[in-house]
């Protein structure tokens, strides 16, 4: 199976959220690189990224940027065509920075680098308890099925389950699932699987022309997909934080 894998390090990793807000996790505090990368994204997919709301996540940095640098980044991103609207919730320093910038914090995109205090050693484990029979496994949530076409401007979300679409997903439409997505018609809009961060979710489609596909926030737009995969039956999955696409034999 032919697959697609882009192997390069970007200054900022952009993830797509299920609420239509993108999360820019800053890896390298290089304002010019971050702005140029965002400008290129907007140029490649203006309908997707033009004037898109963006959350800035500084959790991948060892030090929070100073106020002047953060202001320069926000201004540069606005000039690149997106709208930075908040910071990802994180440390007390990020809280202070958000106040100085006059932007809110969003806990949904929680930063993950707050230094942890040295914790005391854990208490000794309790003596083993008498073995009890395991409770019956919980039944998985039933998947959601959409029998009719998802038209431009519509959004369909399958919470805590897979999504099956028996018809087409039109351009400008969006289908989202916390699990995997199966599309038996043409996919011309956007499909976002693993919306709550499940990296094992997949997307299956019989006729692939997607504007965008995303798994656990990692995404790929149509312009980045080889021509020989367009119009084919494909599967999409995540491998080492990279979106891969392959034809179904």
Curated annotation (Swiss-Prot):
Signal peptide location: none
Region entry Disordered, spans: 115-144
Keyword set, alphabetical order: Cell cycle, Cell division, Septation
Biased composition (Pro residues): 118-139
Taxonomy, superkingdom: Bacteria
Entry keyword annotation includes Ubl conjugation: no
Pfam families assigned: MinC_C (PF03775), MinC_N (PF05209)
A biological-process GO annotation: cell morphogenesis
Coiled coil location: none
Described purpose of this protein according to its UniProt entry: Cell division inhibitor that blocks the formation of polar Z ring septums. Rapidly oscillates between the poles of the cell to destabilize FtsZ filaments that have formed before they mature into polar Z rings. Prevents FtsZ polymerization.
Quaternary structure and interacting proteins, as annotated: Interacts with MinD and FtsZ.
Family, similarity comment: Belongs to the MinC family.
PANTHER family listed in its UniProt record: SEPTUM SITE-DETERMINING PROTEIN MINC (PTHR34108:SF1)
Protein name per the record: Probable septum site-determining protein MinC
Gene symbol of the encoding locus: minC
